[in-house]
């Protein structure tokens, strides 16, 4: 949890990215914790202490789409324990027994308050529906459902030439090197940082400015859902306006767009095209009236999200019969909470390059969004197949065809049984290669030997060589023990194939994952800088040659030796996202919270 931006709003920095939490958001807004001290005596919170996207306070009393009984119950229980004198660490241990509190025992109380706040705000764990699993199930859902809610992120625009944010080659990775003074990559969308230094934003803006790109297969698929009367709403986190370019009408641009701009000094309004020249030249656009900096009407951290979003979600949550998340990491609230606000029996599909540890979709289709959507379109047939043909024709006419020709028909599915047989074969081959080679026994020099001094020297060199071999073999074995063999799934996807690696996970080209032959589980490939792909301000080193970086097993607390300075209240928690390896730390915290601030923030969680 981080500081508020007013009496009616509340923010949390959890689950790897800044998340919007306000009193409009009764999941948090209904909560209340206060210490024995009068809340009126609580210190004013510092609006500069955290990045946030907050919603309009005008709809506080009317929006209740994020109610959650479990979170309410936990907060009330935390309130009682706090009133009884329990420490934040003790509260964590009692309310969240599955959380490994021993890992944070040596941290400061302020850090414990921050972690407790984050745990109380975490999105509820969604229970997977057992009757929806396979790619075929997904196709059937698209055929039969009539009120499909599609939530899209940057992944749907990658094939258009627009970089995403968190991949190894994404915008955040490049900002780290190009703007070393940037506190962290997400500061590019911090309204306070923008006012001080708009250059990083304008450096990035050129890459997604409207008018340069052709909508992707994924955009056209969503439009066809709308045309066929199946689309309830497209909630997009993107600001590239490609939904409008595609002709999608039932779209909510959750985070705004470049279509309109405003002077940050005098409020003069501009059309997005009026700053086109400056944006494409990577120059900061200035107001013609007062020379103030012009900002596109994109929702920055620290600005109102707007009322339209909440009104639509409140209406749609009761109508939706299928949720489809395409190309989003679901790390930014409140959009990330949409899958958790609908009826528990509504099936949900994830189409993304990687599995999301904080989101239990019923069906996971992992890989490049367009490759997956193409396969679904071929299965649906009719107008959906025609849109693929039309898209390919446009790309060919514009000379934008890829070196590797996209699939022209449905992919051949490697079944889960066949996949596991391949894994077992690979494991047997790997085990056989690990068998130690027999070496001849070392020969000692007999006392009565009359070998020359030269022979003695050769014998010593022979022993030394064998010892070196032993050392190398030991190192190799140790590596294999620490880092089990990973099977590259992408090698199986040639010749227009996809792989069912589990009952509910199907892998396509572009998936950022491998298969662990030891645990028989899917593991994420590491992006740039291991676990620094989100909004943490700490710097992290990346060792491309390290085998540990093959897995998403970002460092847990076991890997850290915290210095005395780290344990002070100013500690920048090295609790980065641990992804699939440690469920305790599927979020990150950017700062600590003192008890008074914790009390003040929780007071504002009530309706």
From Swiss-Prot:
Oligomeric and partner information: Interacts with ftt-2 and par-5. Interacts with daf-16 following heat-shock, which causes daf-16 to accumulate in the nucleus. Interaction with daf-16 is promoted by ftt-2. Interacts with transcriptional coregulator hcf-1.
Binding site for NAD(+): 153-172, 237-240, 327-329, 352-354, 369
Effect of gene knockout: Reduces the longevity-extending effects of nicotinic acid when exposed to 1 mM nicotinic acid. Defective ascaroside-mediated responses with neither ascr#2 nor ascr#3 inducing lifespan extension or conferring thermotolerance. Reduced germ cell apoptosis in the gonadal arms following DNA damage induced by UV-irradiation. RNAi-mediated depletion results in an increase of 'Lys-16' acetylation of histone H4 (H4K16ac) on dosage-compensated X chromosomes in hermaphrodites.
Cross-referenced Gene3D superfamilies: SIR2/SIRT2 'Small Domain, TPP-binding domain
Residues that hold Zn(2+) according to the record: 263, 266, 287, 290
Top-level taxonomic group: Eukaryota
Catalytic activity: N(6)-acetyl-L-lysyl-[protein] + NAD(+) + H2O = 2''-O-acetyl-ADP-D-ribose + nicotinamide + L-lysyl-[protein]
Catalytic site positions: 255 (proton acceptor)
Purpose: NAD-dependent deacetylase. Involved in metabolism, apoptosis, response to oxidative stress, response to DNA damage, and determination of lifespan. Required for a reduction of the 'Lys-16' acetylation of histone H4 (H4K16ac) on dosage-compensated X chromosomes in hermaphrodites. Plays a role in germ cell and somatic cell apoptosis in response to DNA damage. Functions upstream of daf-16/Forkhead box protein O in the Insulin/IGF-1-like signaling (IIS) mediated pathway, promoting daf-16 mediated transcriptional activation and increased lifespan.
Protein name in UniProt: NAD-dependent protein deacetylase sir-2.1
GO cellular component terms, A-Z: chromosome, telomeric region; cytoplasm; nuclear inner membrane; nucleoplasm; nucleus; perinuclear region of cytoplasm; rDNA heterochromatin
Family that this chain belongs to: Belongs to the sirtuin family. Class I subfamily.
Keywords: Cytoplasm, Metal-binding, NAD, Nucleus, Transferase, Zinc
Gene that this polypeptide is encoded by: sir-2.1
Biased composition (Low complexity): 55-64
Disulfide bridges in this chain: none
């Amino acid at each position: 949890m981080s500081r508020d931006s007013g009496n009616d709003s509340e923010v949390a920095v959890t689950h790897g990215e800044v998340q919007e939490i306000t009193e409009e958001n009764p999941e948090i807004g209904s909560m209340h914790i206060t210490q024995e001290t009068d809340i009126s005596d609580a210190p004013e919170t510092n609006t500069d202490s955290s990045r946030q996207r907050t919603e309009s306070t005008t709809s506080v009393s009317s929006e209740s789409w994020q109610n959650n009984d479990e979170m309410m119950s936990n907060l009330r229980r935390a309130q009682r324990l706090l009133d009884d004198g329990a420490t934040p660490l003790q509260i964590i241990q009692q309310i969240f027994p599955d959380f490994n509190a021993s890992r944070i025992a040596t941290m400061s109380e302020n850090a414990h308050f921050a972690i407790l706040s984050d745990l109380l705000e975490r999105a509820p764990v969604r229970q997977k529906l057992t009757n929806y699993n396979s790619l075929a199930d997904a196709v059937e859902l698209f055929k039969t459902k009539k009120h499909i809610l599609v939530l899209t992120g940057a992944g749907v625009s990658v094939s258009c030439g627009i970089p995403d944010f968190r991949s190894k080659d994404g915008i955040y990775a490049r900002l780290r090197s190009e703007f070393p003074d940037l506190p962290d990559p997400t500061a590019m969308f911090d309204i306070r940082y923008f006012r001080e230094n708009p250059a990083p934003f304008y450096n990035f803006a050129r890459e997604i400015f409207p008018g340069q790109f052709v909508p992707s297969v994924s955009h056209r698929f969503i439009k066809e859902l709308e045309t066929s009367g199946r689309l309830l709403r497209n909630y997009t986190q993107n600001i590239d306006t490609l939904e409008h370019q595609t002709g999608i009408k039932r779209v909510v641009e959750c985070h705004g767009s470049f279509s309109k701009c405003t002077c940050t000094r005098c409020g003069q309004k501009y059309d997005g095209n009026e700053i086109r020249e400056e944006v494409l030249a990577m120059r900061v656009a200035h107001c013609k009236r007062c020379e103030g900096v012009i900002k596109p009407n994109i929702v920055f951290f620290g600005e109102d999200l707007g009322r339209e979003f909440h009104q639509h979600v409140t209406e749609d949550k009761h109508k939706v019969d299928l949720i489809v998340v395409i190309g989003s990491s679901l790390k930014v609230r409140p959009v990330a909470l949409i899958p958790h606000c609908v009826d528990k029996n509504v099936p949900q599909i994830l189409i993304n390059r990687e599995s999301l540890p904080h989101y239990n979709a019923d069906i996971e289709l992992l890989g490049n969004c367009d490759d997956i959507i193409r396969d679904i379109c071929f299965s649906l047939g009719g107008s959906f197949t025609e849109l693929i043909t039309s898209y390919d024709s446009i790309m060919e006419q514009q000379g934008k065809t890829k070196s590797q020709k996209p699939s022209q028909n449905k992919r051949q599915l490697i079944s889960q049984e066949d996949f596991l047989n391949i894994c077992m074969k690979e494991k047997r081959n790997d085990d056989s290669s690990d068998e130690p080679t027999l070496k001849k026994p070392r020969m000692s020099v007999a006392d009565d030997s009359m070998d020359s001094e030269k022979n003695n020297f050769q014998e010593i060199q022979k022993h030394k060589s064998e010892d070196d071999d032993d050392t190398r073999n030991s190192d190799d074995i140790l590596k294999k023990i620490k880092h089990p063999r990973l099977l590259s799934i992408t090698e199986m996807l040639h010749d227009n194939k996809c792989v069912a690696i589990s009952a509910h996970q199907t892998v396509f080209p572009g998936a950022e994952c491998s298969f662990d032959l030891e645990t028989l589980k899917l593991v994420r490939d590491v992006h740039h800088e291991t676990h620094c792909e989100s909004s943490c301000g700490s710097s992290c080193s990346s060792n491309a040659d390290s085998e540990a970086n093959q897995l998403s097993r970002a460092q847990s607390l076991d890997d850290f030796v915290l210095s005395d300075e780290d344990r002070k209240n100013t500690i920048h928690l090295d609790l980065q996202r641990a992804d699939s390896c440690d469920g305790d730390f599927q979020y990150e915290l950017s700062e600590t919270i003192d008890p008074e601030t914790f009390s003040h923030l929780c007071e504002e969680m009530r309706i």
